[in-house]
């Protein structure tokens, strides 16, 4: 049985603009309970004792990151990201220690907690190939056609919402992600790059409040979750 990885870093792809929020600034810099969404995300990662470094991939025209109080943290390193999430993650992987494992976490998931990080790190003993956080699907799932008509009810058994962080050995993730992008594969998260390479990642049940802020209504929900966690 494998042991817990000795060296762990975190990667935060933060080069996106979040157009679905309809905001004038990238969504990761919107204010949420007195600081930015990205600030909450970084606070959780930077304060975790097992994470040695946090690498943030930024848009080359980013003018907001340097204003964050977390920007000068000793454990933080910024790199230039790419057009797509996968490009940003790959950029960060190029400066990551090759003997480390990487926790890749969405910039716009500010409600992450240390307990879920601990569970994912500990899962390396059971899933030496890597694993992701997930939440079991609770609702009835429907498939529709182009006209918006229901064509099928999908069995939700063994269906999961993929969350982040996603946790993989740096060297393996870098190679598989690079190869997948070179082949023109559609890569939506790190697990999909590993799956493309024939690897079956593990899945670890995480908290359902680890939501991604994508639409305006998500801000209110994230605010409630953060306030509840602080009590």
Swiss-Prot record:
Pathway recorded for this protein: Isoprenoid biosynthesis; isopentenyl diphosphate biosynthesis via DXP pathway; isopentenyl diphosphate from 1-deoxy-D-xylulose 5-phosphate: step 2/6
Superkingdom classification of source: Bacteria
Catalyzed reactions: 2-C-methyl-D-erythritol 4-phosphate + CTP + H(+) = 4-CDP-2-C-methyl-D-erythritol + diphosphate
Keyword line: Isoprene biosynthesis, Nucleotidyltransferase, Transferase
Gene3D superfamilies: Spore Coat Polysaccharide Biosynthesis Protein SpsA, Chain A
Enzyme kind, highest EC tier: transferase
Site for Transition state stabilizer, residues: 20, 27
EC number annotated for this UniProt entry: 2.7.7.60
Pfam families (UniProt xref): IspD (PF01128)
GO molecular function: 2-C-methyl-D-erythritol 4-phosphate cytidylyltransferase activity
Site (Positions MEP for the nucleophilic attack): 156, 212
GO biological process, one term: isopentenyl diphosphate biosynthetic process, methylerythritol 4-phosphate pathway
PANTHER family for this protein: 2-C-METHYL-D-ERYTHRITOL 4-PHOSPHATE CYTIDYLYLTRANSFERASE, CHLOROPLASTIC
Role of this protein: Catalyzes the formation of 4-diphosphocytidyl-2-C-methyl-D-erythritol from CTP and 2-C-methyl-D-erythritol 4-phosphate (MEP).
Family statement drawn from the similarity comment of this UniProt entry: Belongs to the IspD/TarI cytidylyltransferase family. IspD subfamily.
Name of the protein in question: 2-C-methyl-D-erythritol 4-phosphate cytidylyltransferase
Organism from which the protein derives: Shewanella pealeana (strain ATCC 700345 / ANG-SQ1)
Organism phylogeny: Bacteria, Pseudomonadati, Pseudomonadota, Gammaproteobacteria, Alteromonadales
């Amino acid at each position: 049985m494998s042991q817990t990885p000795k060296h762990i870093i975190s990667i935060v792809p933060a080069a996106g603009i979040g157009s679905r929020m309809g905001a004038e600034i990238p969504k990761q810099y919107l204010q949420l309970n007195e600081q930015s969404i990205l600030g909450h995300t970084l606070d959780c990662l930077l304060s975790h004792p097992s994470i040695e470094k946090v690498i943030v991939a930024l848009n080359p025209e980013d003018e907001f990151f340097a204003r964050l109080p977390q920007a000068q943290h000793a454990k933080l390193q910024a790199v230039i990201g790419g057009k797509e999430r996968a490009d940003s993650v790959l950029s960060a992987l190029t400066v990551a220690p090759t003997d480390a494992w990487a926790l890749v976490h969405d910039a716009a998931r500010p409600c992450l907690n240390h307990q879920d990080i601990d569970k994912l790190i500990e899962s390396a003993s059971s899933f030496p190939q890597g694993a992701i956080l997930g939440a079991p699907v609770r609702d009835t799932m429907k498939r529709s056609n182009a006209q918006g008509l229901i064509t099928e009810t999908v069995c939700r058994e063994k269906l999961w919402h993929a969350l982040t962080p996603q946790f993989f050995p740096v060297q393996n993730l870098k190679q598989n992600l690079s190869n997948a992008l070179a082949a023109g594969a559609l890569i939506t998260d790190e697990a999909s790059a590993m799956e493309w390479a024939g690897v079956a990642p593990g899945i670890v049940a995480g908290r359902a409040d680890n939501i991604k802020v994508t639409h305006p209504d998500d801000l209110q929900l994230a605010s409630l979750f953060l306030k509840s966690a602080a009590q």
